[in-house]
């Protein structure tokens, strides 16, 4: 009986194949999987690296930004030669150089209510590494509507958070944060800073969650928020619950279609 793997693949993925929890069947699942990453920045960089190395067959990666000097302290997909170039294109080149066995699809356009459903509909799992609230709510709502599992991660200064959202099986992002903070209340990484190695830890945890979702193995962070304090080297898990009045995923949902998320986040000034 012929092997489903090429000789090169057997060599490349041998450390996976010998794991009973992965094996040949699991590696085939990874090779057939399609994962979409929102952002090729701090969180998207380590997540994309490890998903590509693991052999995820198709990786879509969306980022409308260009590489800046200040990104290089933490966004390891990019190097000095990429300054001024599209992050999505830079990511594609880096990942395909790491693993020519996979396909990387770059999306240089900004994700909006008009295009996101069509873009992510054919992907199996979504990984959110966005650095702004409008995109986080947009991605959450789109994943709920399409019933796509979602790994959400965020970083701020020395702290990171990760949760895994499986629509209608556990809480969504809106169950955790029903409304965004007023604009300006939470400073950006540009304003507050971020420890360069922090997204490496958080993004790698997100990639681990995605691999477990694909394999159907282990316990995922569904209904749990993992909080990492890098300054004090402390991990803690907090239980989170479905909001019975969630406007998107509850029986009383009032949001039935994607909205203007910039306006939604701006509208909560002073609320």
Where are these regions (language model features)?
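Adenine nucleotide-associated cytosolic modules
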Residues: 1-271
